[in-house]
Every structure is written in C-alpha cells, then in structure tokens.
Amino acid sequence: LLLGEKGCGKHTFAKFIAQQFELEYKEIDEQVTATDLDSYLLSTIDTLYVIDLNNFAEKQQNQFLKFIEEPTKSVYVLLLANSEAGVLNTVLNRSIKHHFEAYTDEQLKQLVNTTLPAQAYEIFKTPGKLLNLTEDSFKQVLDLAEKLVHKMHTATFANALVISTKINYKDLFDKVDLNLFLDAVEFVALDDYKTNNNKQSLDIFLTTIKFKQLASLGNLIKETLMLNYLSTVWEVVHNDISRA
C-alpha cells in the first residue's frame, strides 16, 4: 500500500516497479466487477494490478479483500491512497504500508524544471501538482485563494458560494483544480495570520485543513464538498465578526 499526498508519484512508482520486474501493468478502475477480479486470479500472465483506493468508498473496498489476501502466483497488487483515513481497516491490516516522504523545496526544483515563481514551490509540495501548473494557472489559483481569504468578511453568503463556479469539476481546463485551490488558501490564510495576527485567517486556515483531508479521500462529490467548504468558511468568518 503506497501512501502519499496527491501528486507525490505513486502511479509513477507503480509503473517503475512493473517495468523493473517485467510485469504487465493494469490499473483497476471503478467499473471493476467480482467476475473481473476472479478472471485476474485465473490469469497466468505475471501482472501488476494497481488499485487507486481514492476512487473507491470504504464499502466498495470490501470487494478487494479476497483479491489482496489470496493472490495467485502471477498476481501482484499495489494499492494507492492519499492517506490511511479513506482506507478500510481490513484492507490496511492485509497490507504492507509504504509512506512517501515529503519533498523539500530543493528536491521539487530538481524534479520539476518550470518557470513557475518560487512561491509556487512553497505552496504546492508534490511534483504532480507543480507539473499541472503554468504561470497563468498559478496566478489564477493564487488570485482566487487571496480573494477568499481577504474578502470573505465582506461577502454575502450568496457571493461566497459563487467561488464554487470557478472550480474545475469535469475537466474544464480554464477553471481551478480543487486540491490546488485548497493548498493555496491554506498558504495564504496562514501567511495572513502570521503577518497580521488575523483571527479570521486562522479560522479559514483550520477549516481548510479539515476540508483538505476530506478532499484527499477522492471518492466524494467535489461540487458538494466545495459548497460545504465555502458555507463553513463564510459562517466561521462572520461568526468572528459578530463576536468582535
């Protein structure tokens, strides 16, 4: 079981393993059936099966228990997850866990040679996230994060929810990736709290961390998660104002 933040290289590492051991490589997606899994167990072709558990709710993960507990001679299994939080305990108990260590800024710059500003390496801590950015898209996500942090206290509830329309839910490449947006909000909010001792920014920071953990599970409806996040941020900020 490979554990690490989105974009840290879990899929890349899986492909490297398959290549090094001369195994066929197959990713198992959400369309898999019990019949499919049985057929894989009967195959005589040495194959590395990669299961991204972020795409499966905990109840759905039950279908893999036999597959990972009783693999046949030609079956090799790598499970992937952003964290243990979204993995069924019975799956965890049947797995050998490997955690990807966090990258340093210097390692990221060596791995990802881009023209992005230095600040991008402070905010986004995995190669995959940085590779998904251009200078323009970095500015887009940072501007949106700054708008949330610095203007939420004057926004109406309806205006706060409008931010949800700027997020990419279905491969709309002119919009902002949800995970990148939450990373940027976390950075901007913490920086504002450290600089200005702003209690509202601290509450935005803490709320964002909680919702980042939910977003990392991957099997939630992103638009619903985003609306819940914006609602919560608006409420905590305006509660701070009313108590002031």
What are the functions of these language-model segments?
Residues 52-53, 79-84:
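A short beta-strand-to-loop transition that corresponds to the Sensor-1 phosphate-sensing loop
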